[in-house]
Amino acid sequence: FDEENGGWVDRDKLEPKHFKKWVEFCKARGLGCDFNPTFFSHPKCDPLTLASPNEETRRFWINHGKACIRISQYLAEELGQPCIMNIWTGDGFKDIPADRMGPRMRYKESMDEILSEPFDFNLVKPCVESKVFGIGVEAYTVGSAEYALSYAAANPGKCIPLMDNGHYHPTEVVSDKIPALLTFFPELALHITRPIRWDSDHVVLLDDETKELCKEIVRCGGLDGRVH
């Protein structure tokens, strides 16, 4: 939505000027502002986005991601605080695909192109986020945990890992993953949520896992800016 002119702008055409009111809101309250591309709920989800075999579809979403890099840079410069820009897609399949490798290779190529957009890594922190499954993609998620961690590890200075504690198998806990990742990554980001049986995004409570997350951030020295 183009707040400046009262019209609609498609996602691949978004510009920093469309977010002036966001900056005004944050400045008035002394806040920074994180940002994310939105790779879902759009006619050009076929249903894949960055992993789509359709070049026109994939190009649209790459351009959206690059636009969001520019917007994130603008937000960080205006507000004087780093902007965490998270990349997550719901790309996947409801049943077992014949080709598990192809979509991930296309996703990687798309990510590489998005991150080729110039930005200051001190100001913009692109993240890559995984998910174990979603409604309609129960059998195969392109951006699996192994994919996301491997991509972040292969792109230091361009990308950091992000963990959402609702995006793993119910028997996994993100609190245990924090020290493992901080052993190898200078920085990481978290989405702290409250999953009930799956990624339901209930309002966060001070429950046992939330306490353990906070304990590990402190114990691992994450309060010095390593954990976002």
Role assignments for model-derived ranges:
Residues 100-228:
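Active-site capping/gating regions of soluble enzymes
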Residues 4-5:
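Extended N-terminal export/anchoring regions of large proteins
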Residues 9-156, 160:
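Active-site acidic/histidine proton-transfer and metal-coordination neighborhood
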